[in-house]
Curated annotation (Swiss-Prot):
Single GO molecular function: deoxyribose-phosphate aldolase activity
Sequence similarity: Belongs to the DeoC/FbaB aldolase family. DeoC type 1 subfamily.
GO BP term, pick one: 2-deoxyribose 1-phosphate catabolic process
UniProt KW Lyase keyword: yes
SUPFAM superfamilies, sorted: Aldolase
Pathway field: Carbohydrate degradation; 2-deoxy-D-ribose 1-phosphate degradation; D-glyceraldehyde 3-phosphate and acetaldehyde from 2-deoxy-alpha-D-ribose 1-phosphate: step 2/2
Protein name: Deoxyribose-phosphate aldolase
Length: 215
C-alpha cells in the first residue's frame, strides 16, 4: 500500500461536543492536504461541503448514544446527505440490541439505509457489547444492507483487534476509537479493517512507512 492509498482510507475526524467552525476547517484543510476523508458533525456539513468540495465528507446520525427515535435518525441521515455528506455513520440503539429487540434494531438500520443513496456505516459500539451481542449486531447490519460496520463512537471505549476481526467476517469495517498512531492503524488494517476513523489522522499519515505493508 502506498501513502496516497493509505491516506484515502483515513477518515480525519472532529466530532466532540466542543467542536467549533474553526476546528472543522482545520480538519478539512488537513484532509485536503493529505488526501484523507473528513468526518464532521451534522450541523457543519453544508458549510464543510462548500469549504472543501473535493474532500470526501462523512457525517453521523443518532450520534453518539443511538437513542434517537428511528424516524429522527432517518430524517437526520437524509438531511446531512442533502447538505453534502458522501457517507453517513449511524449509531445503533445499543439498549434495544442488548434487550433482545433485534427486529427493531434491524428495521431501524433498514430505514436509515433506505433514506439515503450513499454508503451507511453502522456503529455497533463494540466496547459495550458481549462477543455474542457483537455478532448479532453485525448480522443485523448485514441483513439491513449496510455498507460498512464501524467499531465505536470513541465515547465508550476504543477499537480492539478482536472486535475488528469478528466484524470483518460480516462487512467491511471502519475501526474507530483510540487509534492515534500509524502503528495502531496498521494493527487495525492487519486485523481486517478497511477504513480508520481518527482525530489524529494527519499524525497517522505522517508516520506512514511502506515497509509495514511489505510481505
Amino acid at each position: 500500500m502506498d501513502r496516497d492509498t493509505f491516506a484515502a482510507r483515513i477518515d480525519h475526524t472532529v466530532l466532540g461536543p466542543e467542536t467549533a467552525p474553526g476546528d472543522v476547517e482545520a480538519v478539512l484543510d488537513a484532509a485536503a492536504e493529505y488526501g484523507m476523508n473528513a468526518c464532521v458533525p451534522p450541523c457543519y456539513v453544508e458549510a464543510a461541503s462548500d469549504y472543501a468540495p473535493d474532500v470526501t465528507l462523512v457525517s453521523v446520525c443518532g450520534f453518539p448514544h443511538g437513542q434517537h427515535a428511528t424516524e429522527t435518525k432517518a430524517t437526520e441521515a437524509e438531511t446531512v446527505w442533502q447538505a453534502g455528506a458522501d457517507e453517513i455513520d449511524v449509531v445503533i440503539n445499543v439498549g434495544r440490541l442488548r434487550g433482545g429487540d433485534t427486529d427493531a434494531v434491524r428495521a431501524e438500520i433498514e430505514q436509515v439505509v433506505a433514506a439515503v443513496p450513499v454508503p451507511v456505516k453502522v456503529i455497533v459500539e463494540a466496547p459495550l457489547l458481549s462477543a455474542s451481542e457483537l455478532r448479532t449486531a453485525c448480522e443485523l447490519a448485514a441483513d439491513a444492507d449496510a455498507a460498512y460496520l464501524k467499531t465505536a463512537t470513541g465515547f465508550n471505549g476504543d477499537a480492539t483487534v478482536a472486535a475488528v476481526e469478528t466484524m470483518a467476517e460480516y462487512l467491511p469495517v471502519k475501526a474507530s476509537g483510540g487509534i492515534g498512531s500509524f502503528e495502531a492503524a496498521v494493527e487495525m488494517f492487519d486485523a481486517g479493517a478497511d477504513r480508520i476513523g481518527a482525530s489524529a489522522g494527519a499524525a497517522i499519515v505522517d508516520g506512514f512507512d511502506p515497509a509495514a505493508f511489505e510481505t
